[in-house]
Structures are given as C-alpha cells and as structure tokens.
Swiss-Prot record:
The chain crosses the membrane at residues 6-26, 42-62, 81-101, 110-130, 132-152, 227-247, 252-272, 286-306, 316-336. InterPro entries: Integral_membrane_TerC, Integral_membrane_TerC_rswitch. One of its GO terms (biological process) is response to tellurium ion. Its main location: membrane. The keyword Transmembrane applies. Keywords: Cell membrane, Membrane, Plasmid, Tellurium resistance, Transmembrane, Transmembrane helix. GO terms for cellular component: plasma membrane. Could conceivably alter the intracellular level of tellurium in a manner leading to resistance. Alternatively its presence in the membrane may provide a barrier to entry of the tellurium ions. It is a multi-pass membrane protein. This is Tellurium resistance protein TerC.
Amino acid sequence: MVSTHIGFPTETVIVFIALSVGAIFIDLFMHRDDKPISLKSAALWSVFWVVVAMAFAGFLYIHHGAEVASLFVTGYALEKVLSVDNLFVMMAIFSWFAVPDRYRHRVLYWGIIGAIVFRGIFVAIGTSLLSLGPYVEVVFAIIVAWTAVMMLKSGDDDDEIEDYSQHLAYRMVKRFFPIWPKLRGHAFLLNQKEVDAELAKPENSDVTIGRGKKAALYATPLFLCVAVVELSDVMFAFDSVPAIIAVSREPLIVYSAMMFAILGLRTLYFVLEALKQYLVHLEKAVIVLLFFIAAKLGLNATDHIWHHGYSIAATTSLYVVLGVLALGILASVMFPGKPESEEKGS
C-alpha cells in the first residue's frame, strides 16, 4: 500500500475525502430547498453526522489499529467541546443580520468551505499563525458582547430587515466593494444586470449602492453574513487547533477530527434554534452565554498577552454552558408563557 507524505496510505486519504464530501453532498442535496429546518429533522441530521464520523473511526480501527482510532475519537470529542461556544455565536450572528430561517442552512453550509480551507491552513503551518490568536480573540470578544447587548435590547423582535443601508456591517464594508443593501432570495452575489433590474423597481428608488460605481459583482447582506460566520470559524480555530495538535501531530487525524466535528456542530445549531420555539426562555440563556463567552475570550486572550493569570478552562466553560442551558430549559418548563407560534398567530 502506497503511503502519502502525511504518513497514511493513499487509500485512507481517499476514504476520508469520499466520506466527508459524499456526506456534505447528501446534506446539501436534501436541504436544496429554502425551508426552515424542524426539530426532528435537525436531530436526525445531527445523528447522521455522528454516524459518519464513527464510520471513519471504524475504518481507522480496522486498517490502522485501536491507537489511531482512539486519537481520532479524542480529537473529534475535543473539537466538539471546544466549539460549543461557536453555536451561540452563530445565533448571535444570525440575530444581528436578521437572516430568515429559510436561508440559514445555506449560509452555514457555504461557511463550511471557509472552515475547510482555514482549518487546513492552520493544520499545515502548525502553530506559527496561531500567535495572532489573542489579538483576534480580543476583537471578537468585543463584537460578541456588543451583539449580546443588541439581542437584549431587541427582546422578541425577530422581524426581517428590508433595507440594510443603516446596518453596521454594510456601512463598514461598502467603502471597499459594492454591496446591494437588500436580500434577493438566497443569492450571495448579484451581477450588474440583476442590480439594474432591482434599481428599476419603484420601491428601490432611494437605494444607493456601495461605492456608487458600476461593478461586475455586488455582494448581498447574505454574503456579509457568510463572511462573519467564516470569521467566527477562524477565531475559534485559534483555540481548538493547538489543543487537537497536542493530542496528535498527524495532520490527517487532526484535520479529519476537526472537519467531522464542525460538520456535526452545524446541524446541532438547528436543534438549538428549533428548541427556541418550544423553550421560550432559551434565548435569554443564550444571551447570558454570549456575555460569558465574551468574558472568556477576553480573559484568555489578555492572559496570553499580559500573563495576568486569569483564564477560563475549556472544561469550566463546558460546565457553564450546560448549566445555563439547563436553567433556561427548566425556566421554560416551569414558566412556559406563550410559544412563539401562538404569539404570531394571535
């Protein structure tokens, strides 16, 4: 059997690529329509991704032994634990952009492309790029805390945004490249012909576009949302990649463990999102967790920079997340109030 430069036979690399790409294709094909994902569907797809990961672990066990399979499962579990915070940051991002439920799966799964690329880069170069981590975390801690404040102020207001002209992300980015300030279906980019057609509509008579010049392509608010999701993936990679590299220095083990965990976490996001319809106080718990995550990022980052000795360990973070979620669920059971579906119908 021919071995690759990463220490595994070509057959193993092919199995990993075929299994992961095939599973992504199945997932995307089954969710090709822009429809909100139900709790049952989200739960089943979460199980699907766990089964796919364990199938690869089984292959490693049969062909490379128990030790290699154990390293993969350890890395997989570690990535899951370290990326739990990312679930709540995703909620914050979607809340900030007021992305309709029907487009969220598309946004998250296009975000996978960035995750695949950036995690691959981090694994390839080891820890040299990770030295930037603390500075990225400080910036992201501020953004997460600010988003939590915005969610707290908005309360139960989940209305879609018709025009993003005053949105902070739009105002920050429009000076660099042209943006169409409204959602146009699930499109991420529009060409000049499509933009001209939109500008011809009476309701868009007062719309101004980015730099005010004609361009080959225009980004939409959905594209900006994908970019922020990508940024969150990169930011959390600064935490998880060194931890998993500490488990195994074998690139394929590290990369495959991260990828299967990330793919599964995205479906777990939809489980949490669907539960919000039934657990009316879960969103309050999410807001509390966002403040906690911001504090954790800030403490850990500044400890790396200034060595003040205060930080929050991954295990402590997991206990806090589980505890706050449990309180949110308990409060929803004891004080159910009105589910969102009833409030919208009344």
